[in-house]
Amino acid sequence: MTVPAAAALLLTACSNDAESATPSSSTTSTSVVAEQGDQLESNKTVVTDFYELAFNGRQVQQAADRYLGDVYIQHNPTAADGAAGFVSGIGGYVEATPGLHAEITRVFAEGDLVALQSHTTSAPGDRGQAVFDIFRVDNGKIVEHWDAIQDVPETSANPNTMFDGPTSSPSKSSEVLERNTANALTFLQLAFNEGKAAEAADQLVGPTDTQHNPSFADGKDAFVTALAGIEPVTGDKATKFPRTVAEGDFVFVQTFASSGEGTAGSGSMDIFRFDENGKIVEHWDAVQDYPSTTASGNTVWDDGR
């Protein structure tokens, strides 16, 4: 073998070795997605463990010490910022409610946010409350919190509870999550800010719509009828959509409409379930009227970052 031929053979072998040692872009992409999925599951575990320890374990101080960050920004209007605010505000409620039980029904995560729906009761047989929470997690600690709370009424316009139905779904591509999130926001914008409930339903609600809001019957027609009188709203009075959390077939949306007096207004946290065509087929929510002042000085919807 000549020297040039040997050199060529050596270069070819080195090239092959380098190619085999360099991860392909698809392998790298899969690894990144897996790491992101692991982080989302870790964040969900932090939040659910915190919730269980504080509310069902009744160990409020221990939950705060273990899971809350050095900076904890509170948007629940009755509690102050910080772990101390959580312990004094929420701890007092837990202590005064010996029969308290919180059943977590749905948990979703996206980015650094974890959204949670639960059914909280104060005694056996109590209708209880629908509680929707959003937590922001940073380096394994909870650093910010928003919520919406609604009493479960005695009667409902539909045969469903505020909590039943599917609780999870297979994971979806980022493109599907982005599409469903955009559709949820467009639906709310059309219905509540533009006064176009019929258009919102025609474009974005599937032929079968299961409703868990106790004020509405099942189906798109009931929704359109209930919102038929809404006038377009702009400016400061328009409904805001501060944050969303999408996972699987579900999109969790926070809303807030100011009344114009301090921090007062009406807000909700909604869960929409979508079909494969990006149409809404199921809906859960909690709706709350918020006061004009808060214990923390924060609004119930803004972002402390």
Residue positions per predicted region:
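Sec-dependent N-terminal signal peptides
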Residues: 1-6
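C-terminal motif of bacterial Sec signal peptides marking the signal peptidase cleavage site
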Residues: 10-13
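C-terminal and inter-domain tail/linker signature
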Residues: 16-305
